[in-house]
Amino acid sequence: MDVSPLPPYLGPVSSPTEPSRTPDFLNHDRPPVPDIVVPRGVQPFHLRDKPVRGRLVRLGALADALLTRHDNDPAVTTLAGQALALTAGLAAALKFRGSFSLQAKGDGPVPMLLADCTDSGALRGYARADAEKLAPHLADGATPTAAAMLGQGYLAFTCDQGPEMERYQGLVAIEGDSLTEMTGSYFRHSEQLATHVHLACARTPSGWRAAALILERVAGAGGVGEELDEDAQDDAWRTALALAATLTDTELLDDTLPGERLLHRLFHLEGLALDRARALSYGCRCSRARLSGVLAGFGADDLDHMAEDGVITMTCEFCNLGFRFDRSDITSAEQG
């Protein structure tokens, strides 16, 4: 993996630009977090005696709860939903304690796309959009590609296991029109791992839904595919890809079609075996206490500059909740 240690990261706690919708303001410590848990949000699986493993990700109502915190154009919301599903699926394949994140940063009308998932399945994310720059891409009802929205920049996947551990990041230039193609480029260049990624996000009669199907070719050793010679492994991988290619966005996002049945439709003739499912939940972790600690790290002059009529306002970019602080209540780091 192409990795490099990163400096400490606090996360986006305050928006430097106007939020995508008017934030809801709170003065108590913890915002009301939606009690949404998807028990089988990620369904890992493998194909017996074949070099194929995968994850089916379906966010269900969790997608709507996360995506509707911001009043973005549907094209931007679709991109954000795909990022959420992809991040949940990739995180489920790792053994870690902390958070795993996807970040795309570019010079386009959506300069920042971010999603992260903890080891317990708490998921959050957002897309920061510039409506003025985006408008030309939406002319005549056009739907811009992910590449057009993000522009030139980079795609990064980061595993953060806390302040006592190094953070590792795989980073590649944005290549490809869609987030699916960008992810494929990342795995080819950084992981050198054969993958198949199908991402879907759309507004349905039940609200926004987001889902993903991820396939990975694994090494022949270790019990998966070890009984097959190289040619047979190649054939098994090609067969899995051909079957996965028959999946439609409609099927992937269909709440009435259980995930187990969907996987059975695709792979039942290939020795499908379901592994332990993973729950996903609403995962914004902002709080008044945390943001107060961030403010305390600024100098007095900076705090004075932030204040308007004696009040400092901070908005969580993930959930779009705003917090108000009296300037007189914040003691800067230089004041001790």
Language-model-detected regions and their locations in the chain:
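Interaction interfaces in information-processing and related assembly proteins
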Residues: 3-276
